[in-house]
Amino acid sequence: VVVIDHHSPGDLITKEEKDGEIVGGTVAVDEYVDTHVNPYLVGGDSQLTAGALATEVAHIINPEIKDLIKHLPAIAALGDHAECGEVYQYLELAAEKGFTKEHLAKIAECVDFEAYFLRFMNGRGIMDTILAVDNIDKHEKMIDALYKEYLKRVDTQLKAAIPNIEKTHFENGIYFNMIDVEKYAHKFTFPAPGKTCGFVHDSVVQALGEDKPIITLGHGPDFGVIRATDA
Protein backbone atom coordinates (compact mmCIF):
# COMPACT_ATOMS: atom_id res chain seq x y z
CA VAL A 1 0.00 0.00 0.00
CA VAL A 2 1.40 3.38 -1.07
CA VAL A 3 0.00 6.61 0.38
CA ILE A 4 0.73 9.99 -1.22
CA ASP A 5 -0.97 12.76 0.71
CA HIS A 6 -0.49 16.34 1.89
CA HIS A 7 -2.87 16.42 4.85
CA SER A 8 -1.57 16.22 8.40
CA PRO A 9 -1.07 12.54 9.31
CA GLY A 10 -0.98 13.28 13.04
CA ASP A 11 1.86 13.71 15.49
CA LEU A 12 5.28 12.35 14.60
CA ILE A 13 6.14 9.23 16.59
CA THR A 14 9.79 9.39 15.61
CA LYS A 15 11.77 12.09 13.88
CA GLU A 16 15.25 12.57 12.52
CA GLU A 17 16.73 16.04 12.58
CA LYS A 18 19.68 17.65 10.84
CA ASP A 19 20.87 21.17 11.59
CA GLY A 20 17.67 21.80 13.54
CA GLU A 21 15.36 20.74 10.72
CA ILE A 22 13.23 17.59 10.44
CA VAL A 23 14.52 15.41 7.60
CA GLY A 24 12.53 12.27 8.35
CA GLY A 25 9.78 11.02 10.60
CA THR A 26 7.14 8.37 11.14
CA VAL A 27 3.49 8.48 12.18
CA ALA A 28 1.01 5.91 13.46
CA VAL A 29 -0.39 5.02 10.02
CA ASP A 30 3.06 4.00 8.76
CA GLU A 31 2.61 0.68 10.52
CA TYR A 32 -0.11 -0.22 8.02
CA VAL A 33 1.38 1.02 4.72
CA ASP A 34 4.45 0.12 2.70
CA THR A 35 5.31 3.66 1.61
CA HIS A 36 4.06 7.00 2.90
CA VAL A 37 4.91 10.19 0.99
CA ASN A 38 3.87 13.27 2.96
CA PRO A 39 5.49 16.70 3.44
CA TYR A 40 4.71 16.61 7.17
CA LEU A 41 7.16 13.72 7.56
CA VAL A 42 10.04 16.02 6.61
CA GLY A 43 8.93 19.20 8.36
CA GLY A 44 6.72 20.50 5.55
CA ASP A 45 3.03 21.31 5.42
CA SER A 46 -0.06 20.99 3.23
CA GLN A 47 1.05 23.69 0.78
CA LEU A 48 3.06 21.08 -1.11
CA THR A 49 0.11 19.19 -2.56
CA ALA A 50 -0.44 15.50 -3.18
CA GLY A 51 -0.74 16.24 -6.90
CA ALA A 52 2.76 17.70 -6.94
CA LEU A 53 4.15 14.83 -4.87
CA ALA A 54 2.52 12.21 -7.11
CA THR A 55 3.98 13.92 -10.19
CA GLU A 56 7.46 13.87 -8.69
CA VAL A 57 7.08 10.17 -7.82
CA ALA A 58 5.90 9.44 -11.38
CA HIS A 59 8.92 11.28 -12.76
CA ILE A 60 11.26 9.24 -10.56
CA ILE A 61 9.65 6.00 -11.72
CA ASN A 62 9.68 6.98 -15.39
CA PRO A 63 11.97 9.94 -16.26
CA GLU A 64 10.84 9.82 -19.90
CA ILE A 65 7.48 11.43 -19.03
CA LYS A 66 9.03 14.46 -17.33
CA ASP A 67 8.06 16.99 -20.00
CA LEU A 68 4.61 15.47 -20.52
CA ILE A 69 3.56 15.90 -16.89
CA LYS A 70 5.60 18.85 -15.64
CA HIS A 71 2.57 21.19 -15.71
CA LEU A 72 0.47 18.94 -13.44
CA PRO A 73 1.87 20.17 -10.09
CA ALA A 74 0.81 23.71 -10.98
CA ILE A 75 -2.74 22.50 -11.67
CA ALA A 76 -2.81 20.69 -8.33
CA ALA A 77 -1.49 23.76 -6.50
CA LEU A 78 -4.09 26.10 -7.97
CA GLY A 79 -6.85 23.58 -7.35
CA ASP A 80 -5.90 23.42 -3.67
CA HIS A 81 -5.16 27.17 -3.37
CA ALA A 82 -1.64 26.31 -2.24
CA GLU A 83 0.92 29.05 -1.69
CA CYS A 84 4.61 28.34 -1.18
CA GLY A 85 7.89 28.79 -2.99
CA GLU A 86 7.52 25.52 -4.86
CA VAL A 87 4.17 26.63 -6.30
CA TYR A 88 5.78 29.57 -8.11
CA GLN A 89 8.48 27.28 -9.45
CA TYR A 90 5.85 24.87 -10.74
CA LEU A 91 3.98 27.75 -12.39
CA GLU A 92 7.21 28.70 -14.17
CA LEU A 93 7.66 25.12 -15.39
CA ALA A 94 4.08 25.09 -16.71
CA ALA A 95 4.67 28.43 -18.44
CA GLU A 96 7.55 26.83 -20.34
CA LYS A 97 4.91 24.59 -21.96
CA GLY A 98 2.70 27.58 -22.78
CA PHE A 99 0.22 27.24 -19.91
CA THR A 100 -0.88 30.50 -18.31
CA LYS A 101 -1.92 30.64 -14.66
CA GLU A 102 -5.48 31.46 -15.75
CA HIS A 103 -5.71 28.41 -18.01
CA LEU A 104 -4.19 26.14 -15.37
CA ALA A 105 -6.83 27.34 -12.89
CA LYS A 106 -9.54 26.52 -15.44
CA ILE A 107 -8.11 23.03 -15.85
CA ALA A 108 -8.18 22.52 -12.08
CA GLU A 109 -11.81 23.60 -11.91
CA CYS A 110 -12.76 21.37 -14.84
CA VAL A 111 -11.06 18.40 -13.15
CA ASP A 112 -13.10 19.07 -10.02
CA PHE A 113 -16.29 19.43 -12.06
CA GLU A 114 -15.79 16.27 -14.12
CA ALA A 115 -14.67 14.23 -11.10
CA TYR A 116 -17.99 14.96 -9.41
CA PHE A 117 -19.92 13.33 -12.23
CA LEU A 118 -17.47 10.51 -12.91
CA ARG A 119 -17.28 9.53 -9.24
CA PHE A 120 -15.90 5.98 -9.30
CA MET A 121 -16.25 5.42 -13.05
CA ASN A 122 -13.18 5.03 -15.24
CA GLY A 123 -12.74 8.43 -16.84
CA ARG A 124 -9.08 8.18 -17.75
CA GLY A 125 -9.55 9.21 -21.38
CA ILE A 126 -11.57 12.28 -20.45
CA MET A 127 -9.23 13.25 -17.64
CA ASP A 128 -6.17 12.81 -19.85
CA THR A 129 -7.69 15.27 -22.30
CA ILE A 130 -8.65 17.74 -19.58
CA LEU A 131 -5.16 17.55 -18.08
CA ALA A 132 -3.52 17.94 -21.50
CA VAL A 133 -1.49 14.75 -21.30
CA ASP A 134 -3.29 13.12 -24.26
CA ASN A 135 -5.59 14.19 -27.12
CA ILE A 136 -3.96 17.61 -26.97
CA ASP A 137 -5.83 18.77 -30.07
CA LYS A 138 -9.14 18.36 -28.21
CA HIS A 139 -7.97 19.90 -24.93
CA GLU A 140 -8.89 23.54 -25.58
CA LYS A 141 -12.41 22.77 -26.83
CA MET A 142 -13.11 20.44 -23.92
CA ILE A 143 -11.90 22.97 -21.35
CA ASP A 144 -14.02 25.71 -22.93
CA ALA A 145 -17.15 23.53 -22.90
CA LEU A 146 -16.68 22.19 -19.38
CA TYR A 147 -15.72 25.54 -17.89
CA LYS A 148 -18.85 27.24 -19.21
CA GLU A 149 -20.99 24.52 -17.64
CA TYR A 150 -18.94 24.72 -14.43
CA LEU A 151 -19.59 28.47 -14.11
CA LYS A 152 -23.28 27.96 -14.85
CA ARG A 153 -23.66 25.32 -12.11
CA VAL A 154 -21.77 27.40 -9.55
CA ASP A 155 -23.82 30.50 -10.36
CA THR A 156 -27.08 28.56 -9.97
CA GLN A 157 -25.97 27.21 -6.59
CA LEU A 158 -24.83 30.60 -5.31
CA LYS A 159 -28.10 32.26 -6.31
CA ALA A 160 -29.88 29.78 -4.05
CA ALA A 161 -27.37 29.94 -1.19
CA ILE A 162 -26.19 33.54 -0.80
CA PRO A 163 -29.58 35.09 0.13
CA ASN A 164 -29.80 32.60 3.00
CA ILE A 165 -26.47 33.32 4.70
CA GLU A 166 -26.80 34.19 8.39
CA LYS A 167 -24.23 36.93 8.96
CA THR A 168 -22.78 38.06 12.29
CA HIS A 169 -20.07 40.69 12.83
CA PHE A 170 -18.55 40.16 16.27
CA GLU A 171 -17.02 42.90 18.41
CA ASN A 172 -13.56 41.36 17.97
CA GLY A 173 -13.83 42.04 14.24
CA ILE A 174 -14.60 38.51 13.03
CA TYR A 175 -17.19 38.16 10.29
CA PHE A 176 -19.04 34.89 10.90
CA ASN A 177 -21.26 33.47 8.16
CA MET A 178 -23.45 30.41 8.52
CA ILE A 179 -25.64 28.60 6.02
CA ASP A 180 -27.67 25.41 6.13
CA VAL A 181 -26.52 23.91 2.82
CA GLU A 182 -28.87 20.98 3.30
CA LYS A 183 -31.82 23.37 3.29
CA TYR A 184 -30.71 26.24 1.07
CA ALA A 185 -28.61 24.62 -1.66
CA HIS A 186 -29.57 22.42 -4.60
CA LYS A 187 -29.05 18.74 -3.80
CA PHE A 188 -27.50 15.94 -5.84
CA THR A 189 -25.72 18.27 -8.22
CA PHE A 190 -22.45 20.14 -8.58
CA PRO A 191 -21.17 21.76 -6.47
CA ALA A 192 -21.63 19.38 -3.54
CA PRO A 193 -22.25 20.76 -0.01
CA GLY A 194 -18.56 21.06 0.91
CA LYS A 195 -17.72 22.86 -2.31
CA THR A 196 -20.81 25.04 -1.99
CA CYS A 197 -19.54 26.25 1.38
CA GLY A 198 -16.23 27.10 -0.26
CA PHE A 199 -17.91 29.10 -3.02
CA VAL A 200 -20.11 30.92 -0.49
CA HIS A 201 -17.03 31.75 1.56
CA ASP A 202 -15.17 33.01 -1.51
CA SER A 203 -18.10 35.27 -2.42
CA VAL A 204 -18.09 36.80 1.07
CA VAL A 205 -14.31 37.27 0.97
CA GLN A 206 -14.59 38.94 -2.42
CA ALA A 207 -17.16 41.37 -1.00
CA LEU A 208 -15.35 42.17 2.27
CA GLY A 209 -11.69 41.68 1.33
CA GLU A 210 -9.07 39.03 2.05
CA ASP A 211 -7.57 41.16 4.82
CA LYS A 212 -10.68 40.68 6.97
CA PRO A 213 -11.08 37.82 9.50
CA ILE A 214 -13.87 35.83 7.88
CA ILE A 215 -15.23 32.45 8.95
CA THR A 216 -17.89 30.56 7.02
CA LEU A 217 -19.73 27.51 8.33
CA GLY A 218 -21.80 25.37 5.99
CA HIS A 219 -23.77 22.69 7.81
CA GLY A 220 -26.33 19.95 7.40
CA PRO A 221 -28.02 17.46 9.72
CA ASP A 222 -24.86 15.45 10.31
CA PHE A 223 -21.92 17.42 8.90
CA GLY A 224 -20.20 20.77 8.99
CA VAL A 225 -17.70 22.45 6.67
CA ILE A 226 -15.60 25.41 7.81
CA ARG A 227 -13.68 27.87 5.68
CA ALA A 228 -11.67 30.82 6.99
CA THR A 229 -9.28 33.53 5.88
CA ASP A 230 -5.78 33.80 7.37
CA ALA A 231 -6.46 37.26 8.83
Feature-to-residue mapping (PLM):
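Interdomain hinge/lid region at the active-site interface
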Residues: L118, R124-Y150
